[in-house]
Structures are given as C-alpha cells and as structure tokens.
C-alpha cells in the first residue's frame, strides 16, 4: 500500500520495502523483504517477548512480596528479624536475579498463536488477574515462611542466628524450586516442559553456587552473619517447605488460570 493517508489511519500501517518513501514514513511497519509472511513470525516473536516479560514481572513481584510478608509479619508479632538486610540482598541478586534473567529465554508456549489479539501497553502488561495472582502467591509464600520462622524460634527454641540461617536457606531454596511453576502459568507443573530452557538450569546452578559460597567462604559468611549449618539435619523440614510452597503456587495458578486462556 502506497496510500500515505490510509497508512496513517490504519491501526497498524504496513508498507513494502520497495514502496515510496512517503508511504514508509507514514507506516508503522516496513517489510524490507516485501513478504507478508514475515508478519506472522514477527507477531509470534512479539507475543513470546510479552509472555516472558510477564513471567519476569510476576516472579519478581511474587518473591519480593513474600519477603515483605515474612519480615513485616515477624516484626508485627514481636519476633526478631527473620532475615538480615545483607541476606536479603544476597538472595535477591543471586537467586531472584538469575531466575529473572533466565525467563527472557523461555521458548514460546504451545497455544501462543491461538490466543485472541489484545492491546498491550504499560497498563495492560500485568492484568488484574495477574496482579491478583501475584498478591496471592506473595501472601501465601510469605505466611508459609513466617510460620516456619515462628516454629523455629518459638517451638524449637533456636538461637536468633541459627533461625536466621535456616530462614536464609529456606528462602533461597523456595525461590529456586518454585521457578518451574512460573514457566507456564496456564498449565500445572506436572505438564510443564522442564528442559526447554538451558539458561534456566544455568541460573539454578549459579544460585546453588551462590548459596554454597555464602556458607563456605568465611569472609562472606561473616558479612551475612550465617551460623554453622548442617543441611542434612534439617533436610526433611526444608523439603517440606519447598514442596508446600510449590503446592501453594499451583493452587493459586488453578484459581486464577484454571485452563488455557488469556493472561
């Protein structure tokens, strides 16, 4: 189309690379190879990018929300700080940060091109449904970790440093293992394609490496104020927290996205 007024009036004006300069300046999209088939591939890639951007935002807000709940909740009920600022910073950089990075490389989902078109902007990127999911997951995960901290301090009678060390470990592990639930918000974790994103497993490896460094490199251990820790003595408790957290995320997914559909 070389009709400049029509291109300006269209929702998305498309001009050919061989068209006039006036038409190309008036259009939103210029097909350099003069082939309309590239439009489908461009739409598919655009939808994949938006999908992955949503996953990054949802994962970041959900995990950050759980940290706010556990720290704020502990202070409200009169417990000592469950996590120190340095521990939270370490977790956000080495666990949360790497996970967010890996979501950018998620492949497209199977129903991507079967979804209805929708306008996407700053306000539409995270819908009310997604925000409801974020708040629910952040609240449930935060309350789970808060209950763990209350159990460690009140019932087990652990020293503050020992309880904080266990909370630091639990927070990192729940963030790492729950990432698989965020790979596909429209499908349960048992239907998720686990091995489609090698960057995700690289991020998990970096996160575990960061956790080992925190405990094994003495200067960092002192900065984070971590107590001597034997993971085997708390293996059952940590496994239970990880599995319960995944179950809570899956329940929230079922409530907000009960079947394949738009997000």
Q: Which positions does each model-derived feature cover?
A:
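Active-site-proximal beta-strands of protease catalytic cores
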Residues: 14
């Amino acid at each position: 189309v070389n009709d400049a007024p029509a291109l300006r009036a269209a929702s998305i004006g498309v001009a050919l690379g061989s068209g006039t300069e006036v038409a190309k300046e008036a259009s939103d999209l210029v097909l350099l190879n003069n082939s309309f088939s590239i439009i489908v591939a461009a739409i598919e890639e655009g939808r994949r990018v938006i999908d992955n951007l949503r996953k990054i935002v949802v994962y970041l807000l959900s995990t950050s929300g759980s940290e706010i709940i556990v720290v704020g909740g502990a202070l409200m009920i009169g417990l000592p700080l469950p996590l120190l600022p340095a521990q939270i910073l370490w977790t956000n950089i080495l666990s949360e940060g790497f996970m967010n990075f890996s979501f950018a490389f998620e492949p497209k989902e199977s129903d991507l091109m079967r979804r209805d078109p929708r306008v996407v902007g700053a306000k539409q990127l995270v819908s009310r449904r997604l925000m409801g999911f974020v708040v629910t997951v952040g609240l449930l995960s935060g309350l789970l970790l808060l209950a763990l901290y209350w159990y460690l301090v009140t019932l087990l009678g652990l020293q503050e440093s020992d309880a904080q060390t266990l909370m630091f470990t639990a927070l990192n592990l729940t963030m790492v293992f729950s990432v698989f639930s965020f790979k596909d918000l429209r499908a349960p974790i048992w239907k998720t394609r686990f091995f489609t994103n090698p960057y995700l497993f690289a991020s998990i490896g970096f996160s575990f490496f960061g956790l080992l460094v925190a405990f094994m490199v003495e200067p960092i251990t002192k900065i984070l104020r971590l107590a001597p820790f034997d993971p085997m003595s708390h293996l059952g408790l940590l496994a239970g927290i990880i599995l319960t957290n995944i179950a809570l995320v899956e329940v929230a997914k079922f409530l907000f996205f009960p079947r394949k559909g738009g997000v």
